[in-house]
Swiss-Prot record:
One of its GO terms (cellular component) is cytosol. GO terms for molecular function: argininosuccinate lyase activity. It comes from the Bacteria. Keywords: Amino-acid biosynthesis, Arginine biosynthesis, Cytoplasm, Lyase. Pfam families: ASL_C2, Lyase_1. This is Argininosuccinate lyase. Belongs to the lyase 1 family. Argininosuccinate lyase subfamily. The gene is argH. PANTHER family: ARGININOSUCCINATE LYASE (PTHR43814:SF1).
Amino acid sequence: MTKNHKLWGGRFESSLEKWVEEFGASISFDQKLAPYDMKASMAHVTMLGKTDIISQEEAGLIKDGLKILQDKYRAGQLTFSISNEDIHMNIESLLTAEIGEVAGKLHTARSRNDQVATDMHLYLKDKLQEMMKKLLHLRITLVNLAENHIYTVMPGYTHLQHAQPISFGHHLMAYYNMFTRDTERLEFNMKHTNLSPLGAAALAGTTFPIDRHMTTRLLDFEKPYSNSLDAVSDRDFIIEFLSNASILMMHLSRFCEEIINWCSYEYQFITLSDTFSTGSSIMPQKKNPDMAELIRGKTGRVYGNLFSLLTVMKSLPLAYNKDLQEDKEGMFDSVETVSIAIEIMANMLETMTVNEHIMMTSTETDFSNATELADYLASKGIPFRKAHEIVGKLVLECSKNGSYLQDIPLKYYQEISELIENDIYEILTAKTAVKRRNSLGGTGFDQVKKQILLARKELKAE
């Protein structure tokens, strides 16, 4: 066996087998942390110099070397090696090649345990901010679309059956509220992500007189972890993100399910842009909502990433264990999947065509006005339960003869109650049904306007 040349190889007489080395290496995926690793190292060496743990001259040389590596990384000129295992060892090896053995002083008062934790906090903090910006765009898109369709009437559904007519704008604002809650969850997630593990070292802190508050400020974290064991062992912030991402994807998936239905031949409520549709290799007429289907499908992989990390963490003793190498790929994958899904959804909504006439017509050939009739009868003094029974029988009779409630002659209605007047036919129209549901948060046009006004105030404040 050959001598071990790893940076940690002093304890070992021989090297890893190549296939074992490949199994243990993480550079294929954790290289995404490279810019964050160099940023954290820059803060760490600045602190080492200012606290005289290393000389100012040494700190300057290391910072100059890190700047060279940062420039090379941005230019796509850094090459990483599997023999260096992970991004931390690769950066240190590259730094040594640039400035010599003084690079070894960078790791003073630091372990890969607090190093990787710091990198992941920086990475996720960055990605949470990006994701919230994309959610803001999606929410603005929804509000704009809702405002354009306050008076667009469509069937509201329960059990996928026509229930009551609603404003399409009201339907869109329901999703605005969901994505607003998603934003709030990510904001709270940021609170737990915006902590600095740097300086916790392997698990117990360090004997060097480090200044953790200085590195916290330099990295723009809110505060340092107060317990070194927790600092290197904590992955709650990632699990919290994966949970939030799963809920967010669930909301996107529900919306996509409706979009897929709405653009089908059976509904024809909307027409998706060609930009977000594909065809068939055999059926020339097909226009498939593939992007909506993919968002729906990718929701499962985001759920899987959450379950995977929960399973990794469930039996881990304090502090660091190699199992934690498995915390990154799911996080990276969920960040990328959710981010592109939000972008696609916003652009898909901006470019789709709403077939208002078909939506409206769909409410005229159903019994979604049955509740309006029951409410009307109740307003005339008939107990609601009795009114419900009467309307149910009328619906049954109409279903048998192919007519609708609005087709029943006034004379027949007046046999139920002499108080029923000709205004019943206006009450039974879909637009009137929507307009009259003016309770707080309801689908009434005035209520939808209030929802939109409130949403615009919220968006302006962000």
